[in-house]
A protein has these predicted regions:
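PRPP-associated nucleotide enzymes
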Residues: 1-185
Length: 185
């Protein structure tokens, strides 16, 4: 019975769908073509910020037809809650020289902007050939530092969102769409 109630609560916390799986895939296909045109024949390194962007990264790299390499960083500013701590902790850094690449940081969501600005500045200091940011979701009304992505697929209102790699307490990452997380349950 306890497992049933836990599953029921899990499902009840999935709020309204904000962006469908089909909308996500269509937009990623568009962005893949943009990246193809921007970097034709030049060395690209897609840098995924874990954990949230891993699903987006997988789909985006398949939508790009020009050769690209991938790398990962893990940064945390949320520690099993719904509010950012305000501190950026680099849990895993990239393991290569990026000075011979055009680096595209692939992010799941820009919220306050603190985490991404911190990572952007770290990467910029390592002298890539160029540096751009692509984010799946952009929550501008929560921004506390000035930072904009070069490409933002979807602007979203100030909801805590789950799905398509985004989580709450490590759950809901496997949803194929973006939904509002119901905190009131």
């Amino acid at each position: 019975m306890a497992k049933f109630l836990e599953q029921q609560k899990y499902e009840e916390r999935i709020g309204k769908t904000l962006i469908s799986a089909e909308e996500i895939q269509n937009k990623i296909a568009e962005v893949g073509k943009i990246i193809d045109n921007l970097y034709d024949g030049r060395p690209i390194l897609l840098l995924s910020i874990l954990k949230g962007s891993f699903v987006f990264m997988a789909d985006l790299c398949r939508a790009i037809s020009v050769p690209c390499e991938i790398a990962f960083m893990c940064a945390k500013s949320y520690f099993s809650g719904t509010e950012s701590t305000g501190n950026v902790n680099i849990v895993m850094d990239i393991d290569r020289d990026i000075s011979k690449y055009h680096v595209i940081i692939v992010e799941d969501i820009i919220d306050t902007g603190r985490t991404l600005k911190h990572i952007y500045n770290m990467i910029k200091d390592r002298n890539p050939l160029s540096l751009r940011v692509v984010t799946l979701l952009d929550k501008k009304e929560r921004r506390v530092v000035e930072f904009d992505a070069d490409i933002a697929l979807f602007p979203i209102p100030d909801y805590f969102v789950i799905g398509y790699g985004l989580d709450c307490g490590e759950k809901y990452r496997n949803l194929p769409y973006i939904a509002e997380f119901r905190q009131d349950i």
